[in-house]
Amino acid sequence: MNPRYVLKKELLFDPCLDIVGNRLPNYFLDRAAADSSVELAALRTLATGLTDDQVAVIFPEGTRSSAKKRARAMEKIRERDPARADRLAGMQHLLPPRPAGSAALLDGCPAADVIIAWHVGFDGLDTFGGILRHLARRPLPVQFHARRIDRADVPTADGFAVWLDEMWVQSDRAVHALLQQEGSE
């Protein structure tokens, strides 16, 4: 498999990601770009010409999740689109997706299926302090779940954002159920 990644531009501060990441067909997205159309066009170009043995990977949330980031993201969504905020209101673990980048990738490769993936077990490992706290506890098993969705079952245009939100709400519920199960063992 030959992946093409969409990564946030801030990751270029890591010398390894800067050197290796720029030698491969990846795109480092400027999430604060004044003109997002340039960034979205680059994502369409990145996905153009994907073959059956290649994959484009995007993290629709845009960054690692935390309660503070989730609250801030939901606040922004509520200001712009109250109906969407209502759809996403029950999420407890994942950040809401930002659909424009995913839609741009799919526009670039209209025949590609979609894989929705989520995981548990890395919670709290996003800071050095979190790693130290995690070392003092019984380790949780890492679990990764992925689901392939035939492209014919993925809506286009305005329906895509609603569909992606639904996928994220389902994934958030699955994460919650798994964490509840692990907490009761």
Feature annotation, model-predicted:
Residues 1, 51-52:
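Short helix-terminating capping/connector loops at secondary-structure junctions
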Residues 1-37:
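Catalytic core of membrane glycerolipid acyltransferases/transacylases, capturing the structured
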Residues 6, 42-45, 101-104:
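Short, hydrophobic/aromatic alpha-helical segments in well-folded domains
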Residues 8, 29-31, 117, 147-149, ...:
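Conserved beta-strand termini and adjacent loop/short-helix elements that scaffold enzyme active sites
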Residues 12-24, 52-155:
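A cross-family acyltransferase "interaction/gating" segment
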Residues 36-48:
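A Trp-anchored, charged/polar loop motif used as the substrate-binding/catalytic surface
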Residues 105, 181-184:
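Exposed, interaction-prone extracellular/peripheral surfaces
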Residues 137-182:
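A recognition module on extended beta-rich or small alphabeta surfaces enriched in W/G with H and D/E
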